[in-house]
């Protein structure tokens, strides 16, 4: 946000980030795609290595997936579009909201299940107040449900009930979108925005389609494409699980440490 105080804060943070980059022996980023498009990371290209993040979810409690489906009328209100994020402008909630009329035209019983903090989000009250009148209409009609924050076990019951997960983020504060991998591990395709890094899970694993940043019509088109032909977006879940397995990721860090130790001799 504009203002003298925020300018001072940004200057201090930029200085600290630059010192960290200069003094570090090496920098790890989740994807080369994000690094290449980052004004900060691209300055340190010679000391960058991309390593995917570890991702794992607990198993759902016995009967939890079915209980979730019954409680939220998943069989009657399909397809189910999931979003797992804070209610914030940068997360692109408004883009999904603007896409809903186009989605409902094709699928009149579609619903959005929103997992994540949505009330009293710091700095987002004006955004919340502006969008909520429209969202409340969808809530009344059974097209939108908020859950608030869910713990990992609850998320393990959330994902299997989705037909698609969307990550319509708008700026580079989103570097990857780990929730996409959690969804894919449950066989759920994703529709992210084309932000560097955020587009990589779908690009790498083929489970979904990338939508233009901030474009509600393209987001709707991408979601509809995935919903219309889900078999087309089935991925190799075993391979995906292996790529993000904590032990596999740890091995990549061990290789990096070995290279750095050898280089330092």
Please annotate each region the language model reported.
Residues 125-153:
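Nucleotide-activated donor-binding/catalytic signature segment of Leloir-type glycosyltransferases, i.e.
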Residues 60-74:
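A short helix/loop element that forms part of the nucleotide-sugar donor recognition site in Leloir-type
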Residues 10, 14, 18-50, 55-59:
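A short, active-site helix/loop in glycosyltransferases that binds the activated sugar's phosphate group
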Residues 231-262:
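A charged, aromatic-enriched C-terminal amphipathic alpha-helix characteristic of glycosyltransferases
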Residues 204-216, 224-230:
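Conserved acidic donor-binding segment of nucleotide-sugar-dependent glycosyltransferases
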Residues 160-174, 188:
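Acidic donor-binding loop of glycosyltransferase active sites
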Residues 149-150, 157-162:
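Short alpha-helical donor nucleotide-sugar binding micro-motif in glycosyltransferases
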Residues 74-91, 97-100, 113:
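Conserved donor-binding/catalytic core segment of Leloir-type glycosyltransferases
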